[in-house]
């Protein structure tokens, strides 16, 4: 199991490299980059170790079928729409990203793009593609596919399109030749390279053939894959499971012990997840269960539970455009009523109390921000200043949405309810399936007053925990459910994105965090550790920092005759 110190250095490196200035952009995507702890780019790998003798557990069922147990449904299989971990899991295995995250250095590195350069003082990015990549129908992946895929994202305006919408017009995406594509931004864009880890490429010919009423093939991609990824979609039962088979001619090749099939089953009850893993019927879990679930799985002879620091925030975004949480004093009362110590130590079981939106392990975190502590006297003081009385708050009603079927989520809701009850405030805890939660997040009117959200880094940059949460152009996603910004916050975040100097950019992100916290748009609860359950007969798992990249099934193999039992 990796040590915390090694992993922490690598996390710092992840963000430092992802925010690399355009002057460092270059040939093979493996440039040495500035880090906040002064370490070089040569730390030991983030590979999680198997049992001491390397033998894994005894043979069981499963063979070369990889079974991932997901605690939430897959809302979409279109890579242009993916924004959460199950959607990212599908994209990561069915498609290829332009740039990936190196598993050893956690830096952005070559993938479909084998090299890149900048022109016009960092305003234009030019990518040279590999010449040995084919889609699952056997046709070669070319610059035309890359250009179409990014144009498609900009036109659909979904998923992570906000990374580029304000900076890149489709008319400025240029195919120079079969292997070269250029993106001419309307200004220098500091985190550009980091953003392309969330840009997945589709087969332009197949998608265009299956467009319906200008949907850019969206309906088609809900039941079919059109990628160059390691696996090809066989079946998707929305809300239940996806199944995929290995693409024989995948450009990265296969080993004898690679997984022939990949499937993910949605199981929301922790007791069922634990039983499935204990009986050797599952290969891997997600990271969103309660601490007791992982402790119990770690005691199983056939399951191991790695634990490493991660770039993640757990918080309750407070809907700032909906009464009564549109009142800053109500928001402050809610925040001071919450029991942070119990949340971190008893429910999550590790990590630390968050200090603002950017995880404390991330370069660019504002170290001047102080973690919150429960203070019921202060909570009552702010409540007395509010435009709403306790009676009016209760008459309007406060809704707290939690993800259905997850014990940790339920306990967090109850802990929040207990604190608010001390103030005389009633709280409705509303368990929802993830797909319904994300649907409701598309408008301020339908978004709950507060919602349990785990927000993992979406790219190697603090932009992920600032711009994506608090810039108006990002509103309408589960990530931005506070519906909060100001002109000053928006301008500061825009200045951060314009800067091509790493240190200047990080300073702007720190400035933005201070402005954000003043408005109390969230109850910032924790920066949890990363834990998952892994069957002992799975090898090759690596922590890679960015959400869902850890679940690249092609990078893992089976030891033994099947799953350990």
Q: Predicted segment positions?
A:
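Haloarchaeal acidic low-complexity proteome signature biased toward cell-envelope/secretome components but also
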Residues: 1-62
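Detector for C-terminal structural segments
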Residues: 2, 6, 17-21, 28, ...
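Ligand/substrate-recognition segments at binding pockets and active sites
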Residues: 14, 68, 238, 262, ...
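Short, solvent-exposed loop/beta-turn-alpha elements that line the ligand-binding surface or hinge
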Residues: 87-120, 156, 199-228, 248-261, ...
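Aromatic- and charge-enriched surface segment that lines or borders ligand/interaction sites
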Residues: 114-159, 324
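Alpha-helical secondary-structure segments
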Residues: 142-149, 178-184, 229-230, 259-261, ...
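Surface-exposed binding/hinge segments that line
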Residues: 165-210, 235
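Ligand-site clamp/hinge motif
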Residues: 219, 247-296, 307, 426
């Amino acid at each position: 199991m990796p040590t915390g110190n090694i992993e922490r250095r690598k996390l710092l490196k992840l963000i430092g490299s992802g925010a690399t200035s355009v002057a460092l952009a270059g040939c093979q995507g493996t440039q040495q980059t500035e880090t906040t702890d002064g370490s070089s780019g040569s730390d030991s790998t983030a590979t999680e170790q198997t049992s001491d003798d390397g033998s894994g557990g005894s043979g069981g069922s499963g063979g070369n079928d990889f079974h991932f147990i997901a605690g939430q449904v897959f809302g979409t299989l279109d890579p242009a729409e993916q924004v959460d971990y199950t959607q990212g899991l599908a994209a990561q295995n069915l498609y290829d990203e332009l740039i990936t995250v190196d598993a050893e250095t956690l830096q952005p590195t070559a993938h479909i793009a084998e090299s890149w350069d900048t022109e016009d003082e960092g305003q234009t990015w030019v990518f040279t593609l590999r010449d040995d990549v084919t889609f699952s129908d056997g046709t070669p992946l070319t610059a035309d596919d890359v250009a179409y895929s990014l144009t498609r994202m900009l036109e659909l305006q979904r998923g992570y399109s906000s990374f580029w919408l304000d900076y890149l017009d489709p008319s400025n995406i240029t195919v120079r030749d079969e292997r070269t594509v250029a993106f001419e931004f309307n200004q220098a864009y500091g985190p550009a390279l980091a953003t392309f880890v969330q840009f997945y490429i589709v087969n332009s010919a197949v998608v265009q053939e299956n467009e319906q009423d200008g949907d850019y093939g969206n309906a088609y991609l809900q039941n079919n894959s059109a990628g160059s990824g390691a696996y090809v979609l066989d079946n998707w039962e929305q809300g239940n499971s996806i199944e995929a088979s290995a693409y024989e001619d995948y450009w990265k090749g296969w080993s004898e012990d690679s997984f022939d099939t990949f499937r993910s089953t949605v199981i929301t009850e922790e007791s069922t997840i634990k039983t499935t893993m204990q009986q050797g019927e599952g290969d891997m879990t997600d990271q969103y269960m309660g601490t007791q679930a992982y402790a119990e799985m770690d005691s199983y002879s056939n399951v191991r539970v790695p634990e490493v620091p991660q770039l993640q925030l757990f918080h309750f975004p407070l809907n700032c455009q909906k009464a009564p949480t549109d009142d800053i004093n109500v928001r402050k009362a809610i925040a001071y009523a919450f029991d942070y110590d119990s949340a971190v130590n008893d429910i999550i079981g590790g990590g630390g109390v968050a200090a603002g939106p950017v995880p404390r392990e991330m370069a660019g975190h504002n170290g001047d921000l102080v973690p919150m502590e429960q203070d019921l006297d202060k909570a009552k003081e702010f409540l007395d200043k509010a435009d709403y009385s306790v009676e009016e708050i209760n008459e309007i009603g406060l809704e707290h949405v939690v993800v259905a079927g997850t014990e940790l989520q339920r306990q967090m809701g109850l802990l929040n309810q207990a604190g608010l009850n001390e103030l005389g405030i009633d709280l409705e805890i509303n368990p929802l399936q993830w797909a319904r939660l994300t649907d409701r997040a598309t408008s301020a009117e339908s978004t709950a007053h507060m919602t349990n959200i785990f927000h993992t880094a979406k790219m190697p940059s603090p932009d992920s925990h600032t711009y994506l949460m608090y810039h108006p152009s990002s509103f309408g996603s589960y990530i931005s459910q506070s519906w909060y910004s100001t002109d000053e916050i928006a301008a500061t975040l825009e200045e951060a994105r314009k800067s091509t100097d790493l240190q200047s950019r990080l300073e702007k992100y720190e400035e933005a965090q201070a402005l954000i916290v003043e408005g109390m748009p969230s109850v910032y609860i924790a920066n949890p550790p990363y834990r998952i359950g892994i069957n002992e007969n799975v090898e090759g798992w690596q922590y890679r920092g960015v959400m869902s990249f850890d679940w690249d099934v092609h990078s893992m193999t089976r030891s033994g005759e099947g799953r350990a039992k």
